[in-house]
């Protein structure tokens, strides 16, 4: 009877369980042990945290992408009946396991693409937190999702908000998707001030707790640029129908305007566990212990236009989206290189946009890329961007 009951729980594979999204997803599972179970946990490098998670949540399988950490992981879990694997190929294979119902793609960057494709082909529901997957290969992912009848449920707070606003609106044309942006820690900085900002300053986001890569992307507004591209593929809208509005309080998570002029918005506390839980429970809503929004404290909700002169990455992302093909893949690869350089003090904050723009000019453009083209583009754009860093 126990095993029968266990099988009724949704079995979730978490790719990137040691990151910000992954750890919060485990909090959701912990709050609803009657509904969800962590079937597989994967991490890139943080083996100590992965060991602690495995001991606590007792998954069937754990995978460490960094093969050098395999022996340490295997030894630490030797007293438990948990299968232990290493390497990116193992991550790609684990998503195909029969018992898995849903795959949460919370890996950072381009690395999330191949496991997501494998999970779609295996007809697993996708809780998509790895936005780079749609930025790099949105057209391919959409084609595969349709071919394999695989649902893609957005975990990004903005796209979850739009998704929730569209509930009950089947057949009602969207006039505009309005993505809100906090503006990041440098919203009020002048161009002159932005020349000298440091990684320590950039890593202090005013509203959200996130990993280092996405926090830098938020500070540079590349994160919002990626979300614009992601929205195009998730919601089937044209680039001209996607608008970004800076909303520093992060209370309204995004909005949809319909052709009659009505606007629906989704509001809530800036807590990623809410969109994670909604992706897990969809189409149902389930109770949570998360903080509630107190409207008496929301005395000042403000909105402003983003400044693409100071934050050029947003304009570059729009340009990539309009050009299509492999251009968003080029932008993503260059961005990953420059963010890594910025985090090791190897490039200035504004210098990141310069390198991305030059990489867009120099990398080979492919109008209708296949998967192999994305792989080649990613490698070429990374090489070009690395050479451009002073």
From Swiss-Prot:
Residues noted as binding NADPH in the record, renumbered to the chain: 18-21, 130, 132, 211
Matching SUPFAM superfamilies: 1-deoxy-D-xylulose-5-phosphate reductoisomerase, C-terminal domain (SSF69055), Glyceraldehyde-3-phosphate dehydrogenase-like, C-terminal domain (SSF55347), NAD(P)-binding Rossmann-fold domains (SSF51735)
Family membership noted in the UniProt record: Belongs to the DXR family.
Cysteines engaged in disulfide bonds, as pairs: none
NCBIfam families, A to Z: Dxr (TIGR00243), PRK12464.1 (NF009114)
Protein name: 1-deoxy-D-xylulose 5-phosphate reductoisomerase
Cofactor(s) the protein needs: Mg(2+); Mn(2+)
Reaction(s) catalysed (UniProt annotation): 2-C-methyl-D-erythritol 4-phosphate + NADP(+) = 1-deoxy-D-xylulose 5-phosphate + NADPH + H(+)
One GO BP: isopentenyl diphosphate biosynthetic process, methylerythritol 4-phosphate pathway involved in terpenoid biosynthetic process
Keywords: Isoprene biosynthesis, Manganese, Metal-binding, NADP, Oxidoreductase
Associated pathway: Isoprenoid biosynthesis; isopentenyl diphosphate biosynthesis via DXP pathway; isopentenyl diphosphate from 1-deoxy-D-xylulose 5-phosphate: step 1/6
Positions bound to Mn(2+): 156, 158, 227
Highest rank taxon of the organism: Bacteria
UniProt cross-references to PANTHER family, sorted A to Z: 1-DEOXY-D-XYLULOSE 5-PHOSPHATE REDUCTOISOMERASE, 1-DEOXY-D-XYLULOSE 5-PHOSPHATE REDUCTOISOMERASE, CHLOROPLASTIC
InterPro entries: DXP_reductoisomerase, DXP_reductoisomerase_C, DXP_reductoisomerase_N, DXPR_C, DXPR_C_sf, NAD(P)-bd_dom_sf
Residues bound to 1-deoxy-D-xylulose 5-phosphate: 131, 157-158, 182, 205, 218, 223-224, 227
Pfam families recorded: DXP_redisom_C (PF08436), DXP_reductoisom (PF02670), DXPR_C (PF13288)
Enzyme Commission number(s) of this protein: 1.1.1.267
A GO molecular-function descriptor: 1-deoxy-D-xylulose-5-phosphate reductoisomerase activity
Function: Catalyzes the NADPH-dependent rearrangement and reduction of 1-deoxy-D-xylulose-5-phosphate (DXP) to 2-C-methyl-D-erythritol 4-phosphate (MEP).
């Amino acid at each position: 009877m126990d095993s029968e009951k266990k099988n009724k729980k949704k079995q979730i594979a978490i790719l990137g369980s040691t990151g910000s999204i992954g750890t919060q997803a485990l909090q959701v599972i912990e709050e609803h042990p009657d509904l969800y179970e962590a079937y597989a946990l994967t991490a890139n490098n943080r083996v100590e945290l992965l060991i602690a998670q495995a001991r606590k949540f007792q998954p069937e399988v754990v995978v460490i992408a960094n093969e050098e950490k395999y022996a340490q992981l295997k030894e630490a879990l030797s007293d438990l009946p948990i299968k232990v694997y290493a390497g990116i190929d193992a991550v790609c294979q684990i998503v195909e396991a029969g018992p898995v119902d849903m795959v949460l793609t919370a890996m950072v960057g381009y690395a999330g693409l191949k496991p997501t494709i494998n999970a779609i082909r295996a007809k697993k529901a996708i809780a998509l937190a790895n936005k780079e997957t749609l930025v790099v290969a949105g057209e391919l992912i959409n084609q595969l999702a349709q071919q394999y009848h695989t649902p893609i449920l957005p975990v990004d707070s903005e796209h979850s908000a739009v998704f929730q606003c569209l509930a009950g609106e089947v057949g009602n044309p969207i006039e505009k998707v309005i993505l809100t942006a906090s503006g990041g820690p440098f919203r009020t900085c002048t161009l002159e001030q932005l020349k000298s900002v440091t990684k320590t300053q950039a890593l202090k986001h005013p509203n959200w707790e996130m990993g280092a890569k996405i926090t830098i992307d938020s500070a540079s507004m590349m994160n919002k640029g990626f979300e614009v591209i992601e929205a195009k593929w998730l919601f089937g809208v044209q680039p001209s129908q996607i608008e970004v509005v800076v909303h520093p309080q992060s209370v309204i998570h995004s909005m949809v305007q319909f052709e009659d002029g009505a606007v629906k918005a989704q509001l809530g506390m800036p807590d990623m566990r809410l969109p994670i839980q909604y992706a897990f429970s969809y189409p149902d809503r389930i109770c949570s212990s998360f903080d509630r929004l107190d409207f008496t404290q929301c005395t000042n909700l403000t909105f402003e236009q983003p400044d693409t002169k100071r934050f050029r990455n947003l304009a570059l992302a729009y340009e990539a989206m309009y050009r299509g093909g492999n251009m968003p893949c080029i932008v993503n690869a260059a961005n990953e290189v420059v963010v890594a350089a910025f985090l090791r003090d190897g490039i200035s904050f504004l210098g990141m946009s310069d390198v991305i723009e030059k990489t867009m000019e120099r990398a080979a453009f492919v109008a209708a890329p296949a998967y192999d083209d994305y792989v080649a583009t990613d490698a070429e754009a990374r090489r070009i961007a690395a050479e451009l860093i002073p």
